[in-house]
């Protein structure tokens, strides 16, 4: 009988670096590699524990003097869109979305570059090459899909693949208890469509249809304008010191989860 067990994951700590969200703060991260047949199970456990995935690495903040990054997940089954969200859905009624294996394309990369060049010129991803993008999409050992959003054109619905212009893309992990939005981007020239909001609403719909209770949005950082949109999707839970807790304005003064 084979009594060997799979090795436990090894965790590492990064060196301090400037925080991309809060000026004057330094960030550190704890991370581990997710490879092999246990990767999907490990991804589930770590995401539920406040980690995020980037390629085959799972990481979470481990900052020495700050606990501003809080993991957020939407309660999909209880979610009801606000009036403004219903307007976003109506305004994007001409969009066709489809789910594909995690495979990059030149069309995706061109959209990705336009998005970065407009929205994140000074960010850590601003110099990503086509090879970097391909690795971001393909380097996964978990259940990852690419969701493409295209404008509907005449003839869509007759063939399997939509043919309209690609205007948004989401890289998404399917887990045992929900969908995790790893990264998403959209055409910055179509800002009036609120495509970021639309993609989150679409993921909530997909989670409901599959009987999955959560949509994981990553980290919310109080005081960061970039992250403010995440608390608009209610009800939601935040990972605090005592575990996942239903969010309310009072949570702003509650201590988040620590190592």
UniProtKB/Swiss-Prot annotation:
Catalytic activity: N-terminal L-glutamyl-[protein] + L-leucyl-tRNA(Leu) = N-terminal L-leucyl-L-glutamyl-[protein] + tRNA(Leu) + H(+); N-terminal L-aspartyl-[protein] + L-leucyl-tRNA(Leu) = N-terminal L-leucyl-L-aspartyl-[protein] + tRNA(Leu) + H(+)
MF annotations from Gene Ontology: arginyl-tRNA--protein transferase activity; leucyl-tRNA--protein transferase activity
Keyword Transmembrane helix: no
EC numbers on record: 2.3.2.29
One Pfam family here: ATE_C
InterPro entries the UniProt entry points to: Acyl_CoA_acyltransferase, Asp_Glu_LeuTrfase, N-end_Aminoacyl_Trfase, N-end_Aminoacyl_Trfase_C, N-end_Aminoacyl_Trfase_N
Localization annotation: Cytoplasm
Family recorded in the similarity comment: Belongs to the R-transferase family. Bpt subfamily.
Role played: Functions in the N-end rule pathway of protein degradation where it conjugates Leu from its aminoacyl-tRNA to the N-termini of proteins containing an N-terminal aspartate or glutamate.
Protein name: Aspartate/glutamate leucyltransferase
The gene coding this protein: bpt
